[in-house]
Every structure is written in C-alpha cells, then in structure tokens.
C-alpha cells in the first residue's frame, strides 16, 4: 500500500456542505475502539493523527493493514505553501507575456482571474473527494470511482501533464544555458562549440543535478529548495519590471557585427543615442524623437550622425508601441491553454496534503488559497511588464526575447542564472507524482526498492530529454499539454470524482450542480482549445514558424 494513502486526514464536517452532519457517527466509535487496540503503536501520535480517512466503513482487518501507514505529516504550513507555490509557478510564467500579446491586456486579466478562481474551486473539489473517497492518491480515487478505466485515466493525465512540465523546464535550460555560457565567455555569437549546444547541456544537467535530486525518498525534503526557487522567480519578476523602463520602443535590435542597434522601420525619423545605464552592457539604446531633432543638430547633421553610427532605421507604424486591450487572432487559441498550464498543481496537491503537519482539509485549502493568490500576483506583474517591454515582438519564452537587445547585461545574466537554478530544482518536484503513479499502477503492493526508485526516475528523465531535443518550440508543449491533460486535472477529473464518490449530497444539491457545470465547462474548453490548435497547425505548421 502506498505510504501517501490514508495518513491521518482530519474528518471535520464540511462547512460548505449542507449535509455535513450526515457523516456516520459510528465512525468515532470504531476509531476509538481501534485506537485502544493499537495504543502502543500510536503512542506518540495526537488524537487527530489517529483518525483515518475511512468514513467508518473499514473493519479491523483493514485498519490493521493500514496501521503502518498512519503516521502524522511532518511538513510545516510554510514549507507546504512553498512546495505548492513552486509546483504552480514552474515555467508557465515565461509564456504569459506571449499570451497577453495575443489576447490583449483586459481580456488577459479577465482570463487569468477566471482560471485562478476555477483552479481554487478545483482544489476544493479534489480535497473534499479525497476525504469522502478515502484515498490521498489520484489514481486510487479514479479506481474507486470508475474502476480500472478511472485509474488509467488519472495515470495518463498526471503523466502527460508532468512530462509536459518537465519538458518545459528542460526547454528553458536548452535555450538559456548556452546564452549564459556565451555571455560569461564574452562571445558575440554562438560559435557552435559543444558547450554552447543546448542538447548536450540538458543531458549534462539532467545527469549531474536533476537525477540525484530525484532520488530523494520524500517530497518534503525539497521544501527548502522550493523556497529558494520562489526567491529566484521573485527576482526574475523584479528585473522584468525594471527593464520595462530601460528598453525603449520601438524595440532596438542588436546588430552583433557592429555592436549597435537598429530599428525595423521604413521612413526617416530622428533618433538620439543614449547609453545603457546597466553595468557592463555592450549596448546603446536609441529613443524615437519623431517631433524634434537631437539636441543641437539640424536635419543634415542628424542624418550625417546617423550615417556615421551605422544605425539602420525605418519608420514604424503608429500603433506599434501602443498596448492592445482586446486581441483575437489564430494565436489566441494558445492563450487559455498557457494560462491553464500555468496554474496546474493538482498532481502535487495530494502528496503535499499527505505530508502536511496537523493536516485537515481546511488547512490544505488555506495553503492552496495562499499559493494560488501569490502566483496570480506574480503572473500578472510578469505578463504585464514583459508585454509592455516587447509588445507584439514578445516571444513565447520571455527571456529569449532579451537576447535581441543585449549582448551582456549583468542584471539579466543574473536573472537567467536564477531562472535556470529555479527550474532545475523544480524538476524533481514534478517527477515525484509521475513515479508514484507508475508505482501505483505497476507495483501496487511491492515494498520500497531503491533500484526501482532509481530506474523509474532515470527512464522518465531520459524520455524528457528526447522530447526536448526533438520538439522545436516550447509553445507547442504549453499549448497541447495545457489543452489536454491540464484540463483533465483541473476541470474534468475532480468534477467527475466528486460527482461519483461524494455520496452524502444529492445530485440536485448546489454542490453537485456546481460540479456538473464545472465538468461541462472543462469538456467544452478542452475540445474547443484543441480544435483551434489543430486548425492552426494545419494552416500554419510548426516548421514554418520562426521564434
């Protein structure tokens, strides 16, 4: 039996349920009688840790079978919040500016708030279903609800979602680590050496850092690394905000051959060269002055100055640097999947819940509320200021867009290092639920084995390395996985498990009507988003896109 299942979850009545008082009173009696019989085994546990998530239906034999698993959680409220926040944050934050560019500011904010609220509601359904269903393992909830098909459905969804998440982290390493190494070595461009090849680098990082961290036995050990990862992401958001006020619009494009910047414009305009105030930067910025000449220069002098500087310039459209509030195009299809992918933490909710100290459903819901709200604020800031920096020129991986502007910039170099460290330390967190799913499916009653523990981690990491090397752009990871498995985990599975396993509420109760509406919304969203993405692939195939 998996150690994450049925570990002393509080069974206080649900305040949200009008039928909360209907929980069997006989449960307390059963719990007390069994507690007396096993008092020596649970001598060091508090009263709550001796209650089992069984709804009073387990007999003495099953209680005895579960006895070894019923030990209290040891992870603090703060560490649990760090772990869940880190699971939410991931690399989705790097794709949000791209989503805003293809939805507009107002539409993006509405969608972001809606997805955050729906994610909170989904966690509420999942936690309540875990209590009523008697398991803290996603696959076993599926098995109790629909038998073997439900177990397989949960397994496939968790595996696809977390493999997509791991792949997106490795994509960041593939794209950003060569740029960091190139900057440290003072190279103006990638020379093609093996140590600047992202495919080689992700293999080295996977074997040297990710695999050893993935061999830890418990998820709680990663609480401190989660806190450090979040600190790195806070630093990332801070620098994105700071750079918004340094990079002018229209976007300066670095000409590596002469060390200057050029604009993508077509008509003459007046520009003034401004030094970049960032330390050790090899870049000069150009500001657009369309209504006056550079100070002290007449028209001919200005033109001569521009000719001598080697700057290429063209006029830009009037609205190129104007923010868009509502945007609808073929890329809008990727916006909602990217947002959904950014808020997925559901495979980690139950493992974190199982390790929460003095756990209760309400306490875990508070952890979820704090984590999702905090990430909502960080997402909004990163998306808004990233979009207002690059507007329509933003890329699907935000940090990669800055390479258009800088050859070397100390704050951005530090940001890239921070993000690389953060995503590298996050990979083991999303690997844990996949390994648990594999063990639950293939080795449900086997004792713990270090060899199996190692081999599953090694195979998963190897498969992700192959995927990252073969898939050309990160957007298709975010879009397709977000539209399929992420919607299963956020919308569909929690709703159907709730409808099936929560017996004490009638089907016409407000709680189940809400879950049914939630299920229908999830189905329509998944079908619609995947259809739009497939249509976009047909008419604008991936090989024709350059990022």
From Swiss-Prot:
UniProt GO molecular function: alanine:sodium symporter activity; amino acid transmembrane transporter activity; amino acid:sodium symporter activity; L-amino acid transmembrane transporter activity; L-arginine transmembrane transporter activity; neutral L-amino acid:sodium symporter activity
Keywords assigned by UniProt, alphabetized: Amino-acid transport, Cell membrane, Cell projection, Disulfide bond, Glycoprotein, Ion transport, Membrane, Phosphoprotein, Sodium, Sodium transport, Symport, Transmembrane, Transmembrane helix, Transport
Extracellular side: 1-104, 173-195, 242-332, 391-411, 475-476, 536-547
Topology Cytoplasmic: residue spans: 126-151, 217-220, 354-369, 433-453, 498-514
Record field: transmembrane: 105-125, 152-172, 196-216, 221-241, 333-353, 370-390, 412-432, 454-474, 477-497, 515-535
Tissue expression pattern: Expressed almost exclusively in embryonic and adult liver, and at lower levels in the kidney. Expressed at lower levels in adult muscle and pancreas. Detected in fetal blood vessels. Expressed in syncytiotrophoblas of placenta during first trimester and at term. Highly expressed in first trimester placenta compared to term placenta.
Domain of life from the UniProt record: Eukaryota
Purpose: Symporter that cotransports neutral amino acids and sodium ions from the extraccellular to the intracellular side of the cell membrane. The transport is electrogenic, pH dependent and partially tolerates substitution of Na(+) by Li(+). Preferentially transports smaller amino acids, such as glycine, L-alanine, L-serine, L-asparagine and L-threonine, followed by L-cysteine, L-histidine, L-proline and L-glutamine and L-methionine.
Protein name: Sodium-coupled neutral amino acid transporter 4
Residues the record marks as carrying a glycan: 260, 264, 276
pH influence on activity: Optimum pH is 7.5-8.5.
Family named by the database record: Belongs to the amino acid/polyamine transporter 2 family.
Keyword Cell membrane: yes
Gene name of this polypeptide: SLC38A4
Coiled coil (UniProt feature): none
Catalyzed reactions: L-methionine(in) + Na(+)(in) = L-methionine(out) + Na(+)(out); L-asparagine(in) + Na(+)(in) = L-asparagine(out) + Na(+)(out); L-threonine(in) + Na(+)(in) = L-threonine(out) + Na(+)(out); L-serine(in) + Na(+)(in) = L-serine(out) + Na(+)(out)
Cell compartment(s), UniProt: Cell membrane; Cell projection, Microvillus membrane
Region (Disordered), start-end ranges: 1-30
Membrane-protein topology: Multi-pass membrane protein
GO CC terms, sorted: microvillus membrane; plasma membrane
């Amino acid at each position: 039996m998996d150690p994450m299942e049925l570990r002393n979850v509080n069974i206080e009545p649900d305040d949200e349920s009008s039928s909360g008082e209907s929980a069997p009173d006989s449960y307390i009696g059963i719990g007390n009688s069994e507690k007396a019989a096993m008092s020596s085994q649970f001598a060091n546990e508090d009263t709550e840790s001796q209650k089992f998530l069984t709804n009073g239906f387990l007999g003495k034999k099953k209680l005895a079978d579960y006895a070894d698993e019923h030990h209290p959680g040891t992870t603090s409220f703060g560490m649990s919040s760090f772990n869940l926040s880190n699971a939410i944050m991931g690399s989705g934050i790097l794709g949000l500016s791209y989503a805003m560019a293809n939805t507009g500011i107002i539409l993006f904010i509405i969608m972001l708030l809606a997805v955050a609220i729906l994610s909170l509601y989904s966690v509420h359904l999942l936690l309540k279903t875990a209590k009523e269903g008697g398991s803290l393992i996603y696959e076993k909830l599926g098995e109790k609800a629909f038998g073997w098909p439900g177990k397989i459905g949960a397994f496939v969804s968790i595996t696809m979602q977390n493999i997509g998440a791991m792949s997106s982290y490795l994509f960041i390493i593939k794209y950003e680590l060569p740029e960091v190494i190139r900057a440290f070595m003072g190279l103006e461009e990638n020379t093609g050496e093996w140590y600047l090849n992202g495919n080689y680098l992700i293999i080295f990082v996977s074997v040297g850092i990710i695999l050893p961290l993935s061999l830890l036995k418990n998820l709680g050990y990663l609480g401190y690394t989660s806190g450090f990862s979040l600190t790195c992401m806070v630093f990332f958001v801070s620098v994105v905000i700071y750079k918004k006020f340094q990079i002018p619009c229209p976007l300066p494009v670095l000409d590596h051959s002469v060390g200057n910047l050029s604009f993508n414009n077509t008509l003459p305009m007046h520009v003034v060269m401004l030094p970049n105030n960032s330390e050790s930067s090899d870049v000069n910025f150009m500001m657009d002055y369309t209504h006056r000449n550079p100070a002290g220069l007449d028209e001919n002098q200005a033109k001569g100055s521009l000719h001598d500087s080697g700057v290429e310039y063209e006029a830009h459209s009037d609205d190129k640097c104007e923010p868009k509030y509502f945007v609808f195009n073929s890329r809008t299809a990727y916006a909602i999947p990217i947002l959904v992918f950014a808020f997925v933490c559901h495979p980690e909710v139950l493992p974190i819940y199982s390790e929460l100290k003095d756990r209760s459903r309400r306490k875990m819901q508070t952890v979820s509320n704090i984590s999702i709200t905090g990430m909502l604020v960080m997402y909004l800031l990163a998306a808004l200021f990233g979009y207002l920096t690059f507007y329509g020129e933003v890329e699907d991986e935000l940090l990669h867009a800055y390479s258009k502007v800088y050859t070397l910039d100390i704050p951005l170099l530090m940001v890239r290092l921070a993000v690389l460290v953060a995503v590298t330390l996050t990979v083991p967190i999303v690997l844990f639920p996949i390994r648990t799913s594999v063990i639950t499916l293939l080795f449900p009653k086997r004792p713990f084995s270090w060899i199996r523990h190692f081999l599953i981690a090694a195979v998963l990491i190897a498969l992700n390395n192959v995927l990252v090397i073969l898939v050309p752009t990160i957007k298709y990871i975010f879009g397709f996985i977000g539209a399929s498995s992420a919607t299963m985990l956020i919308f569909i599975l929690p709703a159907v498990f709730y409808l099936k396993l929560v017996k004490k509420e009638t089907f016409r109760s407000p709680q189940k009507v809400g879950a049914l509406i939630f299920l229908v919304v999830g189905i329509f969203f998944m079908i619609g988003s995947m259809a739009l993405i497939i249509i976009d692939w047909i008419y604008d195939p991936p090989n024709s896109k350059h990022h």
